[in-house]
Regions:
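Transmembrane alpha-helices and adjacent helix-loop boundaries
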Residues: 2-277
Length: 277
């Protein structure tokens, strides 16, 4: 067995008990029942769409136009740009919050703990309304890109701070004590011993958090930023095709999230880490 595989099994077994034959049989039965139920629901929905005329060519023909897909591609690029920028900001801010919360300075610990809980507890939509409605009253006007990106980043930073902290807590305490016995400073212990191992543990979870960031960008219509959802709303207005457009957009978002989740699972297998959900 490879080093990575052994590590992965050890970490996974530490959190979850491996299912036995009976449990695996129950899982297979439950999966089969779920698939049948989902298939039946899909058939029912399609039947209702057919009855109400939503499957008519009238509501789908514009998807044969190249301009439609170019318009959606522009929105997709906008979504990716916001998600990556917000994710990068959240990564840095989340790490800073974790470092502050685990520092020896009591006031800094308190401030970072309060900020972490605040960012985690407040929906990103409320942050967007604050940037969109409140800040302009104080003569602070930001481009629509930043009115969407910064709120999404703040909401994600609180979650990432806790993920970082979970990774740090997963590092064996004995390694820290050994480094202290050698006279290393706390900064060197943190950045040369603890963080490299912690990041290895949490990389899959960090990638998975990008799924949440992508979902949070769907409220871009509030600030009229031309992302995938905003451009979808334009198509709906122009062609009066709500169901067909939203179905296509849903498929695109599902594919995006599947790719991100597959990346997280791949990294998990390579690093031997366990995805925190």
């Amino acid at each position: 067995m490879s080093k990575h595989s052994s590590s992965a099994l050890t970490m996974r077994d530490a959190l979850y008990e491996a299912p036995g034959p009976k449990m695996r049989a129950k899982i297979r039965i439950g999966t089969a029942i779920s698939l049948v139920a989902v298939a039946a629901l899909v058939v029912l929905v399609l039947q209702r769409f057919y009855v109400t005329g939503q499957l008519s060519v009238h509501y789908w023909y514009f998807f044969t136009h190249l301009t439609t897909w170019k318009f959606l591609l522009a929105g997709f690029e906008g979504t990716v740009k916001v998600a990556l920028t917000a994710g990068a900001i959240a990564l840095v801010l989340g790490l800073a919050l974790m470092l502050g919360r685990t520092s020896d300075i009591k006031p800094l610990q308190l401030v970072c703990r309060v900020l972490t809980d605040f960012f985690r507890g407040v929906p990103s939509l409320l942050f967007i309304y604050f940037f969109f409605l409140v800040l302009p009253q104080y003569k602070i006007a930001l481009p629509s890109f930043w009115m969407l990106t910064l709120p999404v980043a703040l909401a994600a930073a609180g979650v990432l701070a806790e993920i970082f902290r979970a990774g740090v807590n997963a590092v064996p305490r004995g390694q820290v004590e050994a480094a202290q016995a050698l006279g290393l400073s706390k900064a060197k212990i943190t950045f040369k011993i603890v963080l490299p191992q912690a990041i290895r543990f949490i990389i899959p979870s960090l990638i998975s958090q990008l799924v949440v960031v992508v979902k949070d960008t769907t409220v871009a219509y509030v600030v009229s930023y031309p992302d995938l959802m905003q451009n979808a709303r334009v198509l709906i207005t122009n062609y009066d095709a709500l169901v067909s457009v939203y179905l296509v957009i849903a498929v695109i978002y599902i594919l995006m999230n599947v790719v991100i989740n597959k990346a997280a699972v791949y990294v998990s297998h390579k690093t031997g880490a366990t995805i925190i959900r």
